[in-house]
Amino acid sequence: MKVGIHPEYKAVKATCSCGNEFEFKSALGKDTIHLDVCGECHPFYTGKQRIVDTGGRVDRFNKRFGAIGSKK
């Protein structure tokens, strides 16, 4: 392998919105990242439903133009 062309591989600290923290190795340029869900709080792994408000494009469209289609 060539010397000096590969990104630095270092420890990154991840913090979830539930408070869970863990470290992993990555070539990511940041020292810390924030996660919305992790293995401790994701509904698939916990079996509990949790509402995650992401406010997607469809919601924005319905908010802007939802009243137009209802007039009949």
UniProtKB/Swiss-Prot annotation:
One of the GO BP terms on file: translation
Chain's gene name: rpmE
Q: Which GO terms describe its cellular component?
A: ribonucleoprotein complex; ribosome
So which cofactors does this thing need? Zn(2+)
Q: Name one GO molecular function term.
A: rRNA binding
Q: Provide the protein name.
A: Large ribosomal subunit protein bL31
What is annotated about its quaternary structure and interactions? Part of the 50S ribosomal subunit.
The keyword Metal-binding is assigned to this record: yes
Gene3D superfamilies reported in the protein's UniProt record? Ribosomal protein L31
Keyword entries, A-Z: Metal-binding, Ribonucleoprotein, Ribosomal protein, RNA-binding, rRNA-binding, Zinc
What family, per the record? Belongs to the bacterial ribosomal protein bL31 family. Type A subfamily.
Q: What does this protein do?
A: Binds the 23S rRNA.
**What Pfam families does the record tag this protein with?**
Ribosomal_L31
Q: Where does Zn(2+) bind?
A: 16, 18, 38, 41
How many cofactor units bind, and how? Binds 1 zinc ion per subunit.
Q: Which PANTHER family match?
A: 50S RIBOSOMAL PROTEIN L31, CHLOROPLASTIC, LARGE RIBOSOMAL SUBUNIT PROTEIN BL31A
